Amino acid sequence: MDYTLTRIDPDGENDRYPLQKQEIVTDPLEQHVHRSVYMGKLEHALHDMVNWGRKNSLWPYNFGLSCCYVEMVTSFTAVHDVARFGAEVLRASPRQADFMVVAGTPFTKMAPVIQRLYDQMLEPKWVISMGACANSGGMYDIYSVVQGVDKFLPVDVYIPGCPPRPEAYMQALMLLQESIGKERRPLSWVVGDQGVYRANMQSERERKRGERIAVTNLRTPDEI
C-alpha cells in the first residue's frame, strides 16, 4: 500500500478540508447591526442554545498512539471525573465521535490512517493534539515520525507536555468548549459552503502574560 500525506496550509486554499480553514465570512456580531432587533436576538439565542448543547456533549474518539493516551484515559477515573464536562462517552467509531484526540507519536505510516479516520467523522468535528510528539514530533526528529499532526490535520487545541497531565487534557476540553461557544454555524442543512465562523482564540501563553509579569515572589519548586 502506498502512503501519501496531504500537507495543510491554513492560510491558503483548502479543497480537502474547506470547513476547517480560517474562515473569511463576516463576523456575525457585525451582521446583527443590519438586522432587526427581534430577529437578531432570536438568532443569537438559537446559536447560543445549539452551541451549549454541542460543547457540553463532546464525545471523544477513542484513538491513542503512545504514552500520552495513558494520561488521557487517567482523566476518566473517579479522581478527575471528566464526565463533569460531558466528554466521558468514548466512541469506537469515528462516525459517532465529535472530536479526535491525537495522543502520542504520529508515525509516517500511521498518518494516512489518522487522516482517513478524520475524514469519516461527521461535521461539526474538532481535533486536539496531545503531547509534544503530536504537536511537533517531540524528541523524535527522524524520518519515521511526522513533525506535528498539524502537517496533515487541522488542529483546534494543542496540549504541551511529555506527557501532559490529565489536568492539562481537561483544560484543553475547557478551551475547546469556550471556542465552540463562540462559533457560528448554519442552524439547518446547507449544501456547499456553510460559512462557519470561528473566533480567533488567544493562546494561553499570551492570555496569561500580564499575570506572569505581575509576579514578584517566586515560589521554590517544593512549594509549587
UniProtKB/Swiss-Prot annotation:
Q: Which reaction does it catalyse?
A: a quinone + NADH + 5 H(+)(in) = a quinol + NAD(+) + 4 H(+)(out)
Pfam family name, one: Oxidored_q6
UniProt keyword annotations, A-Z:
4Fe-4S, Cell inner membrane, Cell membrane, Iron, Iron-sulfur, Membrane, Metal-binding, NAD, Quinone, Translocase, Transport, Ubiquinone
Q: Which cysteines are joined by disulfide bonds?
A: none
Cofactor binding remark: Binds 1 [4Fe-4S] cluster.
Q: Cofactors per UniProt? A: [4Fe-4S] cluster
Where does this polypeptide localize? Cell inner membrane
Q: Which GO terms describe its molecular function?
A: 4 iron, 4 sulfur cluster binding; iron ion binding; NADH dehydrogenase (ubiquinone) activity; NADH:ubiquinone reductase (non-electrogenic) activity; quinone binding
Q: What class of enzyme is it?
A: translocase
Query: Which GO terms of the cellular component aspect does the record hold?
Result: plasma membrane; respiratory chain complex I
Q: Name one GO biological process term.
A: aerobic respiration
Task: List residues binding [4Fe-4S] cluster.
Answer: 67-68, 133, 162
Give the InterPro entries listed for this entry: NADH_UbQ_OxRdtase-like_20kDa, NADH_UQ_OxRdtase_20Kd_su
Mode of membrane association: Peripheral membrane protein
Q: What is its EC number?
A: 7.1.1.-
Coarsely, its chief localization is membrane
Its assembly, as annotated, is: NDH-1 is composed of 13 different subunits. Subunits NuoB, CD, E, F, and G constitute the peripheral sector of the complex.
The UniProt function text for this chain reads: NDH-1 shuttles electrons from NADH, via FMN and iron-sulfur (Fe-S) centers, to quinones in the respiratory chain. The immediate electron acceptor for the enzyme in this species is believed to be ubiquinone. Couples the redox reaction to proton translocation (for every two electrons transferred, four hydrogen ions are translocated across the cytoplasmic membrane), and thus conserves the redox energy in a proton gradient.
Family, according to the entry, reads as follows:
Belongs to the complex I 20 kDa subunit family.
Q: Which NCBIfam families does the entry mention? A: nuoB_fam, PRK06411.1
Q: What is this protein called?
A: NADH-quinone oxidoreductase subunit B
Encoding gene, per UniProt annotation: nuoB
